[in-house]
Amino acid sequence: MLGILVLRLRTERGGHYSMFPGKLLHGALFRCIAAYDPAFASELHARKMKPFTIGFFRRTGRSATAVLRAQELNEPHYAEGEELLLRLTALDENVLAALLRIPLGTVLAAGQLSFIVEEILADGRENTGVIAEEELIAAALSAEDAQKIRVSFRSPTVFRVDKDDCAVPRPSLIFASLADKWTWQELPFAVDKDIVRMVAAKLI
């Protein structure tokens, strides 16, 4: 099973970050997984690729497509009591189970700030949902040929190219990265990364 979830949070201890808090949020979610299944969390920690992704805090009432200013992205400030949304994706059914079962009222400590989990959305609201891999594949294969694909990045995103990081979201890098994640998770239906990269390189 694959899932896209959104945590509705309330800021317990406000303040600001001096840089993008991605690693802090990653650590907070890992602690939630460890609380649910310590043995699985240890095994997960040893993996090269982690089967989940974490988005960025979005203030309630703000459109998901709103463009963030650089300061708001890199040095965000959150007030006590402020409501936020945090988007997660799970590419592993054990991770999905752990995230869906985060107890309401759990405090996510991310650096000097902390946030209380008030609701977990996975029912279609905020473009969330859970789907079986086979169902996703069937839907993709039965869909009409896409004429246009739009990808929006709402948090700092880089792609590994040889020994360097590339911040330019070229189609070949985007879809090759997705192919890697699919393969590393040993999801059904083989994906040939070289073919994916070749086709994606033709996109403009």
Language-model features: locations:
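RNA-interacting cores
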Residues: 1-204
